[in-house]
Amino acid sequence: MSMKESLRKHFSMERFRKIWWKMLLLGLGLASVYLAAYFVAGYHIDFSSITDTIQEQANINLGNILLIGAYIIVLNSLLEEFFWRGFIYDKMRVQFPGWITHAITGLAFSLHHIVFYYSWFSLPIVAAITLGLAGYAIIMNLLFEKTELFSCWLVHAIVDIAQIGIALMVFT
């Protein structure tokens, strides 16, 4: 299937218009989980060392985090959903039973993100984040099965807004 055919197949604005408010609520619910985890676990984490590392290695700081955040929220979330749900998951679900596809893509999605946080936290926290991301990916797979990529994109973008909000709190 060509990219154009894949885009046409997975992006249904007609369907999205009917359910966008449900996706907004789901996104807010998942974002609340991220925020709750931050407020609960945040007391046990030295965020100053993380911000120092991010500033040194990636040149991300309070001055440019909004621009980087806008990229992550709008474009990166779209690219990730198209790749992980619209391509990888869509191809795998045809060839493997559902639970195998969910497990593999959930784990792969979380490991794809581990490069960003493995050096910031202790092993138990890295494991918890990785399992949480795998669970999130499975939720997104199930959402993709029932809806289309616009819905996945909106939910992902809302979760990313929460993450950028956390980053702003950490940097200030």
Which role fits each region the language model picked out?
Residues 20-28, 66-67, 99-104, 127-131, ...:
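Hydrophobic alpha-helical transmembrane segments
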Residues 106-110, 157-160:
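Residue-level recognition of pore/gate-forming positions within transmembrane alpha-helices
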Residues 123-172:
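Functionally important transmembrane alpha-helices
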Residues 1-9, 143-146:
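Structural signal for the C-terminal ends of transmembrane alpha-helices
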Residues 8-76, 94:
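Juxtamembrane helix-loop-helix connectors linking adjacent transmembrane helices
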Residues 1-3, 34, 38, 42, ...:
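Structural signal for membrane-spanning alpha-helices in multi-pass inner-membrane proteins
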